[in-house]
Amino acid sequence: FFVPPAFFPP
């Protein structure tokens, strides 16, 4: 299953 990233770069 796909798990979206919890942290995104600024």
Curated annotation (Swiss-Prot):
Post-translational modification here is noted as: Processed by the macrocyclase-peptidase enzyme POPB to yield a cyclic decapeptide. POPB first removes 10 residues from the N-terminus. Conformational trapping of the remaining peptide forces the enzyme to release this intermediate rather than proceed to macrocyclization. The enzyme rebinds the remaining peptide in a different conformation and catalyzes macrocyclization of the N-terminal 10 residues.
Q: Where in the chain is the Cyclopeptide (Phe-Pro) cross-link?
A: 1-10
Q: How is it used?
A: Antamanide reduces multiorgan injury induced by IL-2, such as lung, hart and kidney edema; but does not have the toxicity of related cyclopeptides such as phalloidin.
Q: What does this protein do?
A: Cyclic decapeptide that belongs to the MSDIN-like toxin family responsible for a large number of food poisoning cases and deaths. Counteracts the lethal action of the Amanita toxins phalloidin and alpha-amanatin if administered before, or simultaneously with, the poisons. Acts probably through competitive antagonism. Its concentration in the fungus is, however, so low that the toxic action of the latter predominates. Shows immunosuppressive activity, probably through the inhibition of the action of interleukin-1 and interleukin-2.
Please report which protein family the annotation says this sequence is part of.
Belongs to the MSDIN fungal toxin family.
The protein's name is Antamanide
Its source organism is Amanita phalloides (Death cap)
What's the source species' lineage?
Eukaryota, Fungi, Dikarya, Basidiomycota, Agaricomycotina
